[in-house]
Amino acid sequence: MQPSFWHDKWASQQIGFHLDEVNALLIDYWPQLELAAGSQVFVPLCGKTLDLCYLAEQGLEVIGCELNQSAVEQFFSDNELPVERQSSGEHECYRTEQVSIYQGDLFRLPKEPLEAVSGFYDRAALIAWPPEMRQQYVECLAGLLPPKSIGLLITLDYPQEALNGPPFAVSDAWIQEHMSPYFEIECLSTQDVLAENPRFVKKQVPWLTESVYRLVRR
């Protein structure tokens, strides 16, 4: 999957993965992590999600990473936030009170901006990668996060042959096998969400589940 894929999606506004409200599962399960106010939280492939605002409203310092410049600029303009921009190595850093977004390639993001991170949130990052790139992403994420960092992972699972991703299907078995070397894993919830996703219904996908995991970096 090339960067041009995501740039084209944003340019044509084919952003069905973007929600116009805070993710309900984030609201339901984030408090269980019990992160103190002032903690730093990393959100990979953040897009322009309103989840960043929710996390900031919990008193957290939010650090995102997003490939597409338009998505980053839309986050600040849509939410009417003042923003400062400065170069940071290979990335551009957009910063306002409590939210910083590094615009550029996640795989090229240095560790230094995340040295004080103690939390993380992945709703649309793991499931955005095709199977051949998924392990590379997991290793990248694990390499960026300090030990004992705690976070939420939200995934989708369905018969992959029934629909072309993204979002791609990620099974519990895959998570346990490929992420357990780096994270302690606890599944908090798995729900049938087929009826809530008309795209999947239209394509006659037989089943669709959404799961929430609590992860702790080893």
From Swiss-Prot:
Molecular functions (GO terms): thiopurine S-methyltransferase activity
SUPFAM superfamilies documented for this protein: S-adenosyl-L-methionine-dependent methyltransferases
Catalysed conversion reaction: S-adenosyl-L-methionine + a thiopurine = S-adenosyl-L-homocysteine + a thiopurine S-methylether
InterPro entries for this protein: SAM-dependent_MTases_sf, Thiopur_S-MeTfrase_Se/Te_detox, Thiopurine_S-MeTrfase, TPMT
Covalent S-S links between cysteines: none
One annotated Gene Ontology cellular component of this protein: cytoplasm
PANTHER family (alphabetical): THIOPURINE S-METHYLTRANSFERASE (PTHR10259:SF11)
Protein name (database record): Thiopurine S-methyltransferase
Origin species: Shewanella loihica (strain ATCC BAA-1088 / PV-4)
Gene name in the database record: tpm
